[in-house]
Regions:
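C-terminal motif of bacterial Sec signal peptides marking the signal peptidase cleavage site
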Residues: 9-12
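Short solvent-exposed beta->alpha transition segments
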Residues: 36-37, 44, 51, 67-146
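Flexible domain-boundary/linker segments
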Residues: 59, 74, 87-88, 160, ...
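Short, low-complexity N-terminal intrinsically disordered segments enriched in polar/charged residues
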Residues: 18-66, 72, 76-83, 201, ...
Length: 233
């Protein structure tokens, strides 16, 4: 946008300096219009590509695609983040969990619940599948009515239909394709829940354990502080 503003500025200055008979100011104006049209066309192309990517992502999640396919929809930072969280789930004790944000503590505790209850359907990439499998953390939100995709330069987003201006998923353009940024998306998804911690003056760990118990108390027992410690990985 800065380059476009600069182009328009140069055109205006050329116009006030007087016109020669060779028509150059008109050419300059046409060039600016062409650039603007090209920019708008690129935005539309990116918008269409983002929509196609998102539909492909949803299809991959709901059809139980393999890890390689799912990783193909994610940024490199997302893959590193998943690996880091999985390692934390295996080694963090209760004191270490005090340093975590709510969404991190929730993910770690949920991972341990999966481990204790033998819920895994794979021996590898477990954090990935916990996040992205059918009925996983993201699938629950993408089944809600969603608003239109929005693109601004190399960033894309989508919100809920009832509040489309508030993003719940963030995408990044990597020169050829759109990728989902999980480290930025997950905090947006859990933001509404975090208001409980503010009201009750809880840290992220306490809220995470409370929310796990609230979600799963009808299905599993011992949803207590035992999940705050590593459980025999």
């Amino acid at each position: 946008m800065f380059s476009l503003a600069l182009a328009f500025g140069i055109t205006a200055c050329a116009g006030t300096a007087g016109q020669s008979g060779d028509g150059k100011p008109a050419e300059s104006g046409a060039s600016a219009q062409e650039k603007n049209a090209q920019y708008e066309g690129q935005l539309q192309d990116k918008q269409a590509m983002l929509e196609n990517m998102f539909n492909g992502f949803l299809s991959a999640v709901r059809n139980g695609s393999d890890a390689e396919t799912l990783y193909g929809f994610l940024t490199d930072t997302s893959e590193y983040w998943l690996d880091t969280l999985e390692n934390h789930a295996k080694v963090y004790n209760s004191e270490a969990l005090d340093t975590c944000q709510f969404y991190e503590a929730y993910t770690i505790i949920l991972y341990r619940l999966y481990e204790r209850e033998h819920l895994w359907e794979t021996d590898e990439d477990r954090m990935l599948f916990m996040m992205l499998s059918k009925s996983g953390m993201l699938d629950r939100f993408t089944n809600l009515p969603l608003g239109p995709m929005k693109v601004k330069n190399d960033r894309g987003s989508i919100g809920l239909a009832k509040s489309p201006e508030v993003p719940i998923m963030i995408f990044e353009w990597d020169d050829q394709n759109w990728k989902l940024n999980l480290p930025e998306t997950v905090p947006l998804i859990t933001k509404g829940i975090e208001s409980i911690a503010v009201k009750k003056n809880w840290n992220g760990k306490k809220l995470a354990l409370y929310w796990i118990e609230k979600e799963y108390h009808m299905t599993y027992s011992r949803l207590d502080e035992s999940l705050l410690e590593p459980i025999g990985f």
